[in-house]
Amino acid sequence: MNAVFTHRLARRADIPALNVLMAASIRELLRDFLAPEAVEASFDVMGLDTQLIDDGTYFVVETGDVIAGCGGWSRRATLFGGDHTAKRDAALLDPRQDAARVRAMYTSPPFARRGLGRLVLGLCEQAAAAEGFARVELAATMAGEPLYRACGYAPIERFETDTRSGVRVPLIRMGKRIG
């Protein structure tokens, strides 16, 4: 039997479940792309940015009462990272010149490769376009890059980000025109 998926905006009450989902996603979905120490180091630079929930720009995808995936977009300057990540910037972007950010895309491992990422990306792109943004950018993990390429995102730059352990985590800044 196929699961029926619905989506809605995330609420603060979802935070505990989102943190569990994100941890499982990082641990399981990155392991085919990164060395074990880089997977663990990824927790330093990935996770939930609750500003997205507060801004009303973070979506959850559910089946029944289970959150199967999540992700959002932002009108703020931060490109990636959770509440605990250094160098976050809450400055508002100008849709006339800046790209909106797609942020914190995660799928619960049992629901991977079932179209949830594509669904959330579409929701993010529609919402950003409705606010006047003509472009979106994101920081892709190695595991996420194939999805983003398939959805029309092009690499802008490859980079590595520092972590507390000294292990550098590879990411790819990617972008797409939406308007």
Task: Identify the residue ranges that each predicted region occupies.
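C-terminal "cap" of GNAT-fold acetyltransferases
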Residues: 134, 138-145, 151, 157-179
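Conserved N-terminal entry element of GNAT/NAT acetyltransferase domains
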Residues: 1-16, 179
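Conserved acetyl-CoA pyrophosphate-binding loop and the N-cap/start of the following alpha-helix
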Residues: 111, 115-123
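Conserved acyl-donor/pantetheine-binding loop and adjacent beta-alpha core of acyl/acetyltransferases
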Residues: 55, 62, 68-112, 127, ...
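Short loop/turn motifs at secondary-structure junctions and domain boundaries
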Residues: 49-55
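Conserved GNAT-fold acetyl-CoA-binding loop/helix
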Residues: 23-48
